[in-house]
């Protein structure tokens, strides 16, 4: 009956700019736009809906209540890290290696927390 998450929505003061950021920096494709809302799709089919926000929001902190980060899976951590670095992305720390998994936190155009990850093996 329940098949999983179809998409996740992010409210942005500038939905178009944020959709374009995901396309330019993370290879998402802007595949649908209506009335100022944008759907962007990752290579694995994951979708984000970017909707207009009413006003600005202070950048989230790691331990605030609510959704804290979106994890972006990569198959070449070093290449992805270099790509983001060359694009001037704001990193929220240094790359880490935890239990064989390589990870790095960074921020999108609006300051939302993203998590780059290359797993040694898939989650169970």
What label would you give each PLM region?
Residues 1-17, 67-72, 120-124:
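N-terminal beta-strand motif that seeds the catalytic metal site of vicinal oxygen chelate
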Residues 29-62, 113-119:
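Conserved short beta-strand elements that form part of the metal-binding/catalytic scaffold
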Residues 17, 77-81:
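Short, conserved charged micro-motifs
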Residues 39, 81-124:
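Vicinal oxygen chelate
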Residues 18-25, 84, 111:
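Conserved active-site tyrosine of GNAT-family acetyltransferases
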Residues 4, 34, 66, 100:
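Exposed loop/turn and edge beta-strand positions of beta-sandwich/beta-sheet ligand-binding modules
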Residues 24-31, 88-90:
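Conserved acetyl-CoA-binding loop of GNAT-fold acetyltransferases
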């Amino acid at each position: 009956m329940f098949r999983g998450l179809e998409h996740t929505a992010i409210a942005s003061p500038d939905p178009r700019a944020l959709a374009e950021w995901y396309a330019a920096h993370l290879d998402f494709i802007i595949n649908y736009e209506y009335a100022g809302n944008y759907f962007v799709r990752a290579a694995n089919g994951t979708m984000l809906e970017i909707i207009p926000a009413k006003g600005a929001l202070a950048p989230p902190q790691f331990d605030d209540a609510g959704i804290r980060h979106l994890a972006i899976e990569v198959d070449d951590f070093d290449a992805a890290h270099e790509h983001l670095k060359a694009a001037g992305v704001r990193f929220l720390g240094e790359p880490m290696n935890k239990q064989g998994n390589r990870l790095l936190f960074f921020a999108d155009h609006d300051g939302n927390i993203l998590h780059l990850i290359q797993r040694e093996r898939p989650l169970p």
